[in-house]
A protein has these predicted regions:
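Generic beta-sheet signal
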Residues: 54, 78, 109, 134-136, ...
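Conserved core of the sugar-phosphate nucleotidyltransferase
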Residues: 115-169
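Cofactor-binding loop segments of dinucleotide-utilizing enzymes, especially the Rossmann-like FAD-
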Residues: 8-11, 56, 111, 136-137
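Conserved N-terminal catalytic core of the sugar/cofactor nucleotidyltransferase
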Residues: 2-8, 15-17, 29, 33-105
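Short beta-strand-to-loop acidic/aromatic patch adjacent to the donor-nucleotide binding site
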Residues: 102-114
Length: 169
């Protein structure tokens, strides 16, 4: 089964620009010589995976082409916005349907998180499931700095509601 990793980067990054950062959020260094984007990609290196990047490529000004323009990458250009990653997916839905066919494994990763996992364990966990969302439950320490985040409410392991860029408190 072919796998796809979708990385929505449609935001304008103004929170970081306003704080004086010159580097787009996804390309900020997080560990030694690796940035957030490279860290996300490395979590999927054992899979036969195609990567779909959703962004406003004019905003990126060709500064990150060495990361973006690769053989297994699909680039979907959207307008910049401040409505969150799910809105980026919404704007890209037509192109996503052209790239992804039925019954293919899809991972979606925001660019403001960093994690590591054993992809073999993940594959066993997601086997025979249509949709799995990896997230944390309840309060997370990063919310002390900025309480705006994306949330979902669940009942019996089913998502009942999703909200983006809302306050936890």
């Amino acid at each position: 089964m072919k796998s796809f990793l979708i990385i929505p980067m449609g935001g304008s990054g103004t929170r970081f620009v306003d704080k004086g950062y010159k580097t787009y959020k996804a390309f900020l260094p997080v560990d030694k010589n690796i940035n957030i984007f490279e860290g996300i990609i490395s979590n999927f290196k054992k899979l036969d995976i195609e990567i779909i990047i959703i962004a406003n490529f004019k905003t990126l000004n060709n500064r990150y082409n060495k990361y973006l323009k690769k053989n297994n990458h699909h680039l979907i250009d959207i307008k910049s916005h401040k409505k969150g990653p799910v809105y980026s997916l919404f704007l890209a839905q037509k192109k996503l349907r052209e790239i992804i066919k039925d019954n293919e494994q899809i991972f979606i990763s925001y660019t403001d998180i960093n994690w590591s996992w054993n992809i073999n364990h993940v594959n066993r966990f997601v086997k025979n499931k249509k949709i799995v969302i990896f997230t944390h439950e309840n309060f997370h320490p990063h919310l002390e700095i900025n309480s705006k985040s994306d949330f979902c409410t669940t009942r019996k392991n089913l998502i009942k509601n999703i909200s983006e860029k809302k306050n936890y408190i």
